């Protein structure tokens, strides 16, 4: 019904994204976690508002270390050139009429230096913070609560 507010997330050609985990299970977890996070933020939309998001690229924080692939995958975070990035298109409708739309390029260059409210075991903690800031800047909506942590097989390793 048109009174229902919600977020619809579509991942366009995820196999072509700049940086995703190597394992297909982890890739699925990441996409599901991103979708769930956008849906949580969408709870702040006004009644009758629908937000359609098409994610066209994801570059996760850190870099996969291909030398350490095996039982334990490693994602190295050095904070130099490996900050999280995402590209998306969005369309906000009010009762079926488009009231805002655009393309957005999200990034957080100082992701390692900043306070982060998400759990340190959440594989998407840096991406969620970046999305929160974009959502607040674009729609004036702050997150209510936290989406559940996304757990992947990758171990984050911080290198200075």
Question: Which ranges hold each PLM region?
Answer:
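Surface-exposed short loop/turn segments
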Residues: 55-93
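A short, structured loop/turn motif at beta-sheet edges
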Residues: 43-51, 91-101
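Gram-negative bacterial Sec-dependent N-terminal signal peptides
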Residues: 1-5
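Short secondary-structure boundary motifs at beta->alpha junctions and helix caps
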Residues: 16-17, 24, 101-133
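C-terminal/domain-edge helix-coil "capping" segments
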Residues: 36-38, 116-160
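N-terminal segment of the mature soluble domain
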Residues: 6, 11-57
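A mature extracytoplasmic/lumenal domain signature
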Residues: 13-15, 55-59, 94, 104-110
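N-terminal, polar/charged subdomain of small-to-medium soluble alpha/beta proteins
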Residues: 6-10, 64, 72-78, 121, ...
């Amino acid at each position: 019904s048109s009174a229902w507010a919600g977020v619809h997330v579509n991942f366009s050609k995820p196999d072509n994204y700049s940086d995703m985990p190597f394992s297909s299970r982890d890739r699925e977890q990441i996409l599901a976690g991103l979708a769930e996070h956008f849906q949580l933020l969408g709870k702040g939309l006004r009644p009758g508002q629908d937000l359609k998001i098409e994610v066209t690229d994801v570059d996760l924080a850190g870099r996969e270390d291909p030398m350490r692939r095996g039982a334990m995958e490693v994602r190295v975070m050095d904070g130099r050139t490996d900050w999280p990035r995402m590209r998306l298109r969005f369309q906000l409708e009010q009762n079926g009429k488009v009231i805002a739309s655009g393309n957005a390029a999200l990034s957080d260059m100082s992701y390692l230096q900043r306070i982060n409210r998400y759990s340190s075991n959440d594989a998407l903690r840096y991406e969620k913070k970046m999305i929160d800031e974009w959502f607040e800047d674009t729609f004036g909506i702050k997150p209510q609560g936290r989406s559940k942590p996304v757990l992947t097989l990758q171990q984050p390793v911080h290198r200075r």
